[in-house]
């Protein structure tokens, strides 16, 4: 553009002094033609720049829309992660509850078995002592000792044992 203006200026200076009236008219027509061409060129250039600016603005708007869509998608993904995290926490709480229940059940069974064992052993001891008392009454013991003494009369080995313990 500067070149065209400089060229036009050069022609005006160079031919301004020695032109005839007809050449001058021709020069003015040429200059007018150049101006018209230049004006057309400028208008076309302006239109191209406007079109380019419009395309850039459209691309920018499209990019902004896409970024908004991506942001919305990230928000959805974040919400989904929160939901999954909440579900996992709930599942962990349920599992801890089940585990604690099982531990309590095992502790109750062990406690019951220990209590039952002590009760049964105590009853067994009492029953055993009662049976022993029934079986080892003094009169039965005397009868047993008399029977052993009778047998010791015929059995020398038994006689030695009873003497050793002072029962003969």
From Swiss-Prot:
Keywords: Cell membrane, Membrane, Transmembrane, Transmembrane helix. Its main location: membrane. The keyword Thylakoid does not apply. It is a multi-pass membrane protein. The chain crosses the membrane at residues 4-24, 94-114. One of its GO terms (cellular component) is plasma membrane. It comes from the Bacteria. It is found in: Cell membrane. To A.aeolicus aq_1446. This is Uncharacterized protein aq_1900.
């Amino acid at each position: 553009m500067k070149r065209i203006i400089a060229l036009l200026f050069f022609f005006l200076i160079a031919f301004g002094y020695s032109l005839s009236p007809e050449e001058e008219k021709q020069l003015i027509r040429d200059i007018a033609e150049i101006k018209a061409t230049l004006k057309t060129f400028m208008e076309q250039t302006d239109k191209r720049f406007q079109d380019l600016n419009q395309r850039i603005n459209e691309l920018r708007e499209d990019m902004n829309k896409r970024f908004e869509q991506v942001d919305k998608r990230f928000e959805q993904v974040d919400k989904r992660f929160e939901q999954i995290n909440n579900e996992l926490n709930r599942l962990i709480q349920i599992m801890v509850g089940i585990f604690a229940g099982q531990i309590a059940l095992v502790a109750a069974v062990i406690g019951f078995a220990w209590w039952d064992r002590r009760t049964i052993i105590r009853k067994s001891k009492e029953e055993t002592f009662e049976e022993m008392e029934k079986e080892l009454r003094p009169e039965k013991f005397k009868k047993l000792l008399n029977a052993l003494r009778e047998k010791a009369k015929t059995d020398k080995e038994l006689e030695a044992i009873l003497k050793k313990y002072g029962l003969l």
